[in-house]
Amino acid sequence: MINAVVFDVGETLVDETREYGTWADWLGVPRHTFSAVFGAVIALGMDYRQAFGYFRPGFDLEAERARRADAGQPETFGEGDLYRDARPAMAALRDMGVWVGVAGNQTSRAGGILRGLDLPADMIATSDDWGAVKPGASFFRAVIDSAPCDAAGIVYVGDRVDNDLKPAKEMGMRTAFIRRGPWGYIWENHPDLPATADWRMTTLAELPDIVAKVNRPAR
């Protein structure tokens, strides 16, 4: 039985094209160049934050976020940055009686933006809210503690094997992989994916049918 579905944020619900484009602008480099280096860093298995260091050695992401905010150019996103399938899929799950959560590695500011979008979710939380960061077990323990069921009744949805699927699986949840965004396409053929993803999707529109099939009473 699937009682709860919890979504990652970046590249699962939110298209981060605009966000990373503004980072390229802030660094003063062409967006195409930034995207190419960003993808190469991910493909090499490095932390995505290392991409910034290629353009500005010693780059401190938290410090630069503060500088952007002080300059009136904070990281931001809105309704137009949501993937088109995000809101309908979440609403369909709630209509089915499934508890819907949103939990990702995001700042408190991003959490406020998410709550302001009035998403069809029962819970919205960020790593800043919990003081716990993926892929740490404490983050996924917080997910389990927030849901109205045990780990076996939760499906965690994300685009990354390392940050989303593997740690959620290790905590006893089921997992759904969404192939989109840089990580989604790069991780699609990763050798660890078959063992860490219970389902693979190309759109969140597939989720309600997945849940319905699992929850359908046996005849």
Spans of features found by a protein language model:
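Asp-based, Mg2+/Mn2+-dependent phosphohydrolase catalytic module
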Residues: M1-V5, R87-R219
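N-terminal helical cap/lid subdomain that shapes the substrate entry/recognition surface
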Residues: M1-V98, T107-G111
